[in-house]
Curated annotation (Swiss-Prot):
Residues 131-141 are annotated as: LID. It is found in: Cytoplasm. GO terms for molecular function: adenylate kinase activity; ATP binding; deoxyadenylate kinase activity; nucleoside diphosphate kinase activity. AMP binds at T39, R44, Q65, L66, V67, G94, Y95, P96, R97, Q101, R138, R149. Consists of three domains, a large central CORE domain and two small peripheral domains, NMPbind and LID, which undergo movements during catalysis. The LID domain closes over the site of phosphoryl transfer upon ATP binding. Assembling and dissambling the active center during each catalytic cycle provides an effective means to prevent ATP hydrolysis. Its main location: cytoplasm. The modification N-acetylmethionine is found at M1. This is Adenylate kinase isoenzyme 1. It comes from the Eukaryota. Residues 38-67 are annotated as: NMP. It comes from Oryctolagus cuniculus (Rabbit).
Amino acid sequence: MEEKLKKAKIIFVVGGPGSGKGTQCEKIVHKYGYTHLSTGDLLRAEVSSGSARGKKLSEIMEKGQLVPLETVLDMLRDAMVAKADTSKGFLIDGYPRQVQQGEEFERRIAQPTLLLYVDAGPETMQKRLLKRGETSGRVDDNEETIKKRLETYYKATEPVIAFYEKRGIVRKVNAEGSVDNVFSQVCTHLDALK
């Protein structure tokens, strides 16, 4: 099973809040048959499952602490192993947020094939998030919080992009355009992997 993961196509998907990376991931799953894994979704699913690990996670998150990297990686690996036979590849969404997370992923799971950087400017992301806030009811979609989230995102992501750029596996997608325009750029990069 470990061998299968080492041979699998693994794509880290990085993009700011409001960059549209969630939408792009959905489209990739639909067209290419990849498995979309979001660390946030995995954590939430584990907590609501009521498992021993879920209970521990719930306590950590309630205290506002960060979930240990080891736990996140265990969950990612479990999810990947479960799909290794049927999946055409894996989209790892919102990970790594730090260089160390990327290094640990490689040590414990496998090397990424590509890092897909869904890149939209801060004004675009802010506009999209404010628009989403009108309908989503998400508490973190207001102007003040959005500015903070974008700052945090840029600080965390720049070193990660730089780290993988040195290896030549970053594929940048201009996410300013329409969903379809962005997706056609994504397809160009993914088709080149075959």
